[in-house]
Amino acid sequence: AGGWSDGKLTYHTSIGGQLSKYCGDEKAMELMDQVINNFKRFHPKPEEVQCSNPVAEPDFIKPYFGLRLFPVWHVGTDYLHEIGKNWYQYLVDGGVNFYWESKVSDINFKTNEVIFKSVKPEFTNMDNDSIFYDNLIFGVGKSGIDFGKQLAEKYNLPTEPKSVQIGVRFEAPQKHFQKLIDVSYDFKLYRKYDDEGVSLRSFCTNNNAAYVAAEHTYGDISYNGHAKKDPSYRNDM
């Protein structure tokens, strides 16, 4: 859950990533436990973290859709920044270094060296322009896709394609979905069309406190719903 996301954690290997592909389902579930426990640990009000765990598909949807039966934890968008601050301070106190206002410009895989350049030299906290590593995790968001592609092409790094999911977001009054919400706060409906080789699923339902944030990437606009916990944000959407 990013700092501007819907503040929910899906507890299953079938949605949200390929972790089990690399470490197996059992280890993936163990790591998910660690993530959820840390979100509670650094939450200013951990007692408000809500778990929705449907145990059976309701009869009224069976002719049309299936329902994923696994837990979803609602942390709350309005708490994510404070959780991030607490988590950050814990890492700093443990000796982890963060380098701000700096940008990775290259990686030398022969010398195990990450090359930096300062974006705003007056604010950077780096003493050197490179860092040596024993092991490197290269994790970038959408804004780093081009840089990742440049590195892969420059050093002939092996890559593999990832499936693409296309989503459409719409807002509707909560009353139209209340029967489903009573079964599962963040209900996950799905339907497979085997003859077409495609499937549909619902995701990111932000019930009774839905706010939409716009994100601009490469000239396109995408939207991400917020699911806030504080009752004062409730808007019946």
Language-model features: locations:
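Conserved catalytic/binding loops enriched for acidic/polar residues
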Residues: 23, 27-42
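Residues forming the flavin
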Residues: 1-22, 49-237
